[in-house]
């Protein structure tokens, strides 16, 4: 694939968060497939996308978190969970009650996806995640 084609393919991939469904719905899937992107290249881009979205995590809105939750369904959910928990444990107190509840809900969904994937499941990470959810929800109720 030429450099220019690689850039165009990556732009499409990032625009739709790697989702073939969304590419198809918007009429860009056939164009994307013409670039013959390898699965290995897509894995590299997914990793870049996860890093980008983690850098965009905010207690002011939850768009990046929502995208990460969606990505966890077809990518390394455990790695996404690890990064979301790291951010949340440091920053969740900055958010209002609504944001705290949304974060708890999304983290729970990522936990479910992590358990479904069941690749070398780290129970310590799951337990830390549940502890963070409990602590955050107690804070909301107080």
Identify the meaning behind each predicted range.
Residues 1-75, 107-112, 123-140:
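Extended repeat-based scaffolds of very large eukaryotic assembly and lipid-transport proteins
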Residues 80-142:
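Conserved binding-pocket/active-site segment within a compact domain
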């Amino acid at each position: 694939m030429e450099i220019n084609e690689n850039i165009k393919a990556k732009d499409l991939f990032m625009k739709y968060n790697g989702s073939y469904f969304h590419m198809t719905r918007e009429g860009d899937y056939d164009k994307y497939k013409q670039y013959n992107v390898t699965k290995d290249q897509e894995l590299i881009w997914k990793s870049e996308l996860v890093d980008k979205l983690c850098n965009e995590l905010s207690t002011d809105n939850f768009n990046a978190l929502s995208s990460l939750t969606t990505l966890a369904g077809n990518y390394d959910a455990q790695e996404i969970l690890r990064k979301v928990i790291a951010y949340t444990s440091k920053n969740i107190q900055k958010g209002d009650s609504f944001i705290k509840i949304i974060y708890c809900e999304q983290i729970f969904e990522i936990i479910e996806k992590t358990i479904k994937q069941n690749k070398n499941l780290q129970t310590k990470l799951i337990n830390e995640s549940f502890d963070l959810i409990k602590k955050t929800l107690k804070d909301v109720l107080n």
